[in-house]
Regions:
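Acidic, metal-coordinating catalytic segment for phosphate/diphosphate chemistry
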Residues: 1-17, 83
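Short secondary-structure boundary/capping segments
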Residues: 10, 18, 98-102, 121-123
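Histidine-centered active-site/metal-ligand motif
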Residues: 13, 31, 42, 103-105
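Residues embedded in well-ordered beta-strands
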Residues: 17-19, 25-26, 109-111
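Conserved Nudix-box catalytic region and its N-terminal flanking loop in Nudix hydrolases
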Residues: 22-79
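Nudix hydrolase/Nudix homology domain
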Residues: 34-36, 102-187
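Active-site segment of metal-dependent pyrophosphate-handling enzymes
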Residues: 62-117
């Protein structure tokens, strides 16, 4: 007998997020989900998660960036490798342009800073609003507001934003993550 009450198969998409930081601030925008979020989005075909995170940062903010604060990748000979994310989140989302029904995003989360040194670059003006959010604002746990849009930060955005700022501080000081170690027996 065939079951008719079986749940629909779960649809999952791979996404990448880049917490863009500069001098004690992280960039967040008002997302259509009604939340303040960092730049991010779906991986394009043949794109690795680092490429996706950096592309999303550039597309959404206009700022070229580089990844910081990742764990030491395991080096295995001359094989290509991708920097590991600082975290991987799984988020249930409503329908979007990639799937009309609710689904999950498996999100590769990276920390990044502007590729070029200098003063904090301007963020896009308009809709959706973008903000450079300070470490003090993240620690205050007060809702963020821009115009008519106000909402508390999701706990993971607050925690990851603070961690990204700390990694950016270490990166500027030259005391970031250690260099990759070669695998035993690798040339």
């Amino acid at each position: 007998m065939e079951r008719t009450d079986a749940p629909e198969p779960l649809v999952r998409h791979f996404t990448a997020t880049g917490f863009l930081t500069h001098d004690g601030y992280t960039a967040l925008h008002w997302h259509r989900l009604g939340k303040w979020l960092p730049p991010g989005g779906h991986l394009d075909p043949n794109e690795d998660p680092v490429q996706a995170a950096l592309r999303e940062i550039r597309e959404e903010t206009g700022i070229a960036a580089r990844v910081i604060g990742t764990a030491t990748p395991y080096v295995r000979g001359d094989r290509a490798r991708v920097a590991p994310p600082v975290s991987i989140g799984i988020y249930r989302v409503p329908g979007d342009s990639h799937a009309p029904a609710a689904h999950e995003h498996i999100d590769f989360i990276y920390f990044a800073r502007p590729a070029e040194p200098g003063p904090r670059p301007p963020l896009p003006v308009g809709d959706p609003p973008w903000l450079w959010v300070s470490e003090a604002e993240l620690r205050a746990q007060a809702p963020l507001a821009s115009g008519e849009r106000e909402a508390p930060l999701p706990d993971d955005v607050r925690a990851l934003g603070l961690a990204a700022i700390e990694w950016e501080r270490r990166d500027r000081a030259g005391s970031g993550a250690p260099a990759p170690a070669a695998a035993p027996g690798a040339a």
